A protein has these predicted regions:
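Ligand-binding clefts/hinges and TM-proximal coupling segments of bilobed small-molecule sensing domains
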Residues: 29-37, 89, 169-179, 253-282
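Acidic, polar ligand-binding/catalytic clefts
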Residues: 89-154
Length: 282
């Protein structure tokens, strides 16, 4: 990713990270013996971590989580280190998004794949505390009706067609924050195709996805702007574990230590600093 100067948005991210301590877990408080020799992992003395197939930037760079490059890959290794695992003791596997969140036993110790923490999901899986809560952003292309907007009022005045995926926080944001009627798609892939074909003027997604789409997917793609995620029901993204996992409390304790030490903010700055380059729409 391009290096950018850390501006106010990054400071805001760091501040927000300090509040991401709530979690939906069913395990007891973490004991002091959260070590590779005592943790009841899928494979003894090995931490098996799952991600998507494929995994995309900026979450994982070049679809190689074992490199530790990318926001989620770096977070995973930071948690592993806090638990006492070396990189050699970390094993990566791949899962689909839906299969990992379904009820039942898991072949991984935790899965990191932008899983939003919700009460409904917590009925069938465990979550750690949150490691990230993203702003929303509008992806468009040069010369579109949304190119050059400076405010939410400008977005409304542009009379543009804005898309979002069904049942997403992005769709809620289009309706409730931008105050425009969205064009709804079955998934982000369909919406991206429509944007590429200029069937819509813009697409609302989370900020990291917006940077990837504008840089790698949408011809002449740009980010029209970002706006805060004000959905109080959005608890952020957490590490996903099997329901009643014996290591949920230890994983949460490790993630909380990564956050409180400032390391999570550093990782966020390294891999998501491009947020400083997207104008804030108010």
């Amino acid at each position: 990713m391009k290096k950018t100067t850390l501006l106010a948005p990054v400071a805001a991210i760091a501040l927000a990270l300090t509040s991401l301590t709530g979690s939906f877990t069913s395990a007891s408080a973490a004991s002091t013996a959260c070590t590779p020799s005592t943790l009841k992992t899928v494979t003894a003395k090995t931490l098996t971590i799952a991600t998507g197939a494929p995994a995309y930037s900026p979450w994982v760079i070049d679809d190689k989580p074992e490199s530790g490059k990318g926001f989620e890959a770096a977070v995973a290794y930071a948690v592993a280190k806090k638990l006492g695992y070396t990189n050699a003791q970390v094993k990566w596997i791949r899962t689909t998004f839906d299969s990992a969140i379904a009820p039942g036993p898991k072949k991984f110790d935790f899965n990191i794949q932008q899983y939003s923490i919700t009460a409904d999901r917590a009925k069938v899986v465990d979550f750690s505390s949150a490691y990230y809560k993203s702003n929303q952003a509008i992806v468009t292309y040069k010369g579109s009706k949304l190119d050059g907007v400076k405010s939410i009022a400008d977005v409304k005045a542009a009379n543009a067609t804005i898309g979002a995926a069904v049942s997403s926080t992005s769709l809620d944001a289009v309706q409730n924050q931008l105050g425009v009627k969205p064009q709804v798609f079955n998934d982000n892939a369909a919406a991206v195709t429509a944007l590429k074909n200029k069937q819509i003027d813009g697409l609302v997604v989370d900020l990291p996805t917006a940077f990837y789409l504008s840089a790698a997917e949408v011809p002449n793609g740009i980010i029209a702007g970002q706006f805060a995620n004000v959905d109080k029901a959005d608890k952020g993204a957490g590490l996903l574990l099997a329901k009643n996992s014996p290591i949920t409390a230890c994983v949460t304790k490790a993630l909380d230590a990564v956050r409180s030490s400032g390391e999570l903010a550093t990782i966020t700055s390294k891999w998501l600093t491009a947020s400083a380059g997207a104008p804030v729409l108010k």
